Amino acid sequence: SVLKSMELDKDNQYLEHNKQILNVLANGYYNHYVSYLDTNNYVKAVDFYQEFKALKKVTDQSVDFNQYEIQHCIMLAQIYKQLYHNDENAIHFIQKAIDSYQCVLALDENNYSANKNLGILYHNLGVETIMKELPVDADLEVVIVMEEKAVNYFTKSLPYLKKVYKMEPTDEAIVHGIAAVYYSLNDTEQHIKYYNLYRDLKNSNSNND
């Protein structure tokens, strides 16, 4: 194997040649990784990605994987969200999606996509919790717990949406999302403020079309 060849090549006579071969192999693993990124094959995709990283490190120990990791975690989060939407009882996939976005923010706290998606994800979880049908004879304590759970999701949503709003204050979807969160939190003043901003943006954008 190439790795064995590098180990035996004490004088580094074939170092560059071996590195070129490893680069080709690494790129092959990366291409397989990309082609397997879907809800059916994502586990295999992760394996290919790890193989790609391992070979890349051999060819260049100083290689910076941050951008690869960011893209990888964003793609995995999207897959986990889709798996959850396919089966809403599989709540563990939503936690995996959250963890994946948090992985992105650990590398780049201002990443637009991760902040936006986390904000929307928490908001949607709050809405889903409220919309979940309870038995007619549901205990009051159960109802209160559900309401508290929804409020917790909405509260978690706000910092991410607010951060994205600072980055892109003309994004209609974000402004509307913030207004919706404040509405759900019964904060009428803030809801009206952001709803008016949303309405003004919508009118402004329609006039520009």
Regions found by a protein language model. Name each.
Residues S1, Q13-E16, K81-K96, N124-Y160:
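Short coil/linker segments at helix-helix boundaries
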Residues M6-I21, A54-E69, D87, C103-N110, ...:
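Flexible helix-coil transition and linker loops at the boundaries of alpha-helical arrays
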Residues Y29, Y36, Y80, Y122, ...:
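Residue at a conserved register position within TPR or TPR-like alpha-solenoid repeats
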Residues M131-P159, K163-D209:
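Terminal, low-structured helical/coil segments at or just beyond the last alpha-helical repeat
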